[in-house]
Amino acid sequence: MRSSCVLLAALLALVAYYVYIPLPSAVSDPWKLMLLDATFRGAQQVSNLIHSLGLSHHLITLNFIIISFGKKSARSSPRVKVTDTDFDGVEVRVFEGPPKPDEPLRRSVVYIHGGGWALASAKISYYDQLCTAMAEELNAVIVSIEYRLVPQVYFPEQIHDVIRATKYFLQPEVLDKYKVDPGRVGVSGDSAGGNLAAALGQQFTYVESLKNKLKLQALIYPVLQALDFNTPSYQQSMNTPILPRHVMVRYWVDYFKGNYDFVEAMIVNNHTSLDVERAAALRARLDWTSLLPSSIKKNYKPVLQTIGDARIVKEIPQLLDAAASPLIAEQEVLQALPKTYILTCEHDVLRDDGIMYAKRLESAGVNVTLDHFEDGFHGCMIFTSWPTNFSVGIRTRDSYFKWLDQNL
């Protein structure tokens, strides 16, 4: 009996050691976040082990784990019709909310899920629940795009998928089929989905027939640039779950089918050092010393290497492509974008990407709402139901829905 108690105590101590990580005191539901992070870290470690044994790509394994625990079939409710179909060969899940009695045509949101361009699905419970609630509360049609993921495809194929599906949906006969008002269609996404939504919005500005098709864009803690991994938020939250800095950099490398040997050099900005001429012209477009307010900059210092590794952008030129990093787009492109909502979280490496994009859009004359949550962390908006229900998740979702309701 005594030996069993000792063994149990030892096991509990090991579990506590694995689960516990220091977190900012202001973050929402810290112990719940630790448990969520430990679960995700465990899945990542299993996936990396399987990868190292040569059995499967780590992202395929990790996504299999994620989807196995949460995939939902298309199931309608009394107020929301849910169907799986495809738009021009791209899988989508469509959520049809009830029309308002005085409005025969409904508004619509094209939604793009997050997951580092490699994980998750429009069909997992988190996004199914989000889009169902959005369709019901906004009396809207939500088109959630099931774009192809890394390592099945790499940049820019994810962008091509969301553009193809959205262009198909915007055809008059398709909008008519779903009883959607063509003047009330927006695009939205979270994290990597926010990146794709921003890229889609910018790509539409190049095509005259698509230029004014979107009424708004709503970007939820979007990832918007791959040039500077030492913004104040990257420095402040480098080890904060559920998106530590090294994980975000690896997602970028995976997206571009790059070499993992470059990750450590990229973390210290060796890929955009002063001797990398191609990066020089773009650096001013994300100069956080001028784009961020002093309350965000605090005492953080820019990390700009004099001599870096020019091989990185030579082998991964996509790092400097505005289609991948919407924050570095030219002013003329930004000027043509619609009304924008950007949600950012204090405890998120991507916080400053969103704040800088809001500033650049404002400077270009775009109507922007920046919605910042001091106790938020990356990914929080989809965590609204037990056992991963966070108070900040519910508040961010409600704030997002409210803005859409008032502006779409």
Curated annotation (Swiss-Prot):
InterPro entries xref list: AB_hydrolase_3, AB_hydrolase_fold, Arylacetamide_deacetylase, GDXG_lipolytic_enzyme, Lipase_GDXG_put_SER_AS
Glycosylation sites: 270, 367, 389
Single Gene Ontology BP annotation: xenobiotic metabolic process
Keyword Glycoprotein: yes
Topological type in the membrane: Single-pass type II membrane protein
Entry-linked PROSITE patterns: LIPASE_GDXG_SER
Localisation: Cell membrane; Microsome
EC class of the enzyme, as a word: hydrolase
Motif, Involved in the stabilization of the negatively charged intermediate by the formation of the oxyanion hole: chain positions: 113-115
Gene Ontology cellular-component annotations: endoplasmic reticulum; membrane; plasma membrane
Reaction(s) catalysed (UniProt annotation): a 1-O-alkyl-2-acetyl-sn-glycerol + H2O = a 1-O-alkyl-sn-glycerol + acetate + H(+); 1-O-hexadecyl-2-acetyl-sn-glycerol + H2O = 1-O-hexadecyl-sn-glycerol + acetate + H(+); a cholesterol ester + H2O = cholesterol + a fatty acid + H(+); cholesteryl (9Z-octadecenoate) + H2O = cholesterol + (9Z)-octadecenoate + H(+)
Keyword Lipid metabolism: yes
Active site per UniProt: 191, 348, 378
Annotated TM spans: 5-25
PTM characteristics: N-glycosylated.
Protein keywords: Cell membrane, Endoplasmic reticulum, Glycoprotein, Hydrolase, Lipid degradation, Lipid metabolism, Membrane, Microsome, Signal-anchor, Transmembrane, Transmembrane helix
Taxonomy, superkingdom: Eukaryota
Stretches of the chain found on the membrane's Cytoplasmic side: 1-4
Molecular function in Gene Ontology: acetylalkylglycerol acetylhydrolase activity; phosphate ion binding; serine hydrolase activity
Lumenal side: 26-408
Family to which the UniProt record says this protein belongs: Belongs to the 'GDXG' lipolytic enzyme family.
PANTHER family given in the database record: AB HYDROLASE SUPERFAMILY PROTEIN C4A8.06C (PTHR48081), NEUTRAL CHOLESTEROL ESTER HYDROLASE 1 (PTHR48081:SF29)
Physiological role: Hydrolyzes 2-acetyl monoalkylglycerol ether (1-O-alkyl-2-acetyl-sn-glycerol), the penultimate precursor of the pathway for de novo synthesis of platelet-activating factor. May be responsible for the hydrolysis of cholesterol esters (such as cholesteryl (9Z-octadecenoate)) in macrophages. Also involved in organ detoxification by hydrolyzing exogenous organophosphorus compounds.
Name the record gives this protein: Neutral cholesterol ester hydrolase 1
Organism: Rattus norvegicus (Rat)
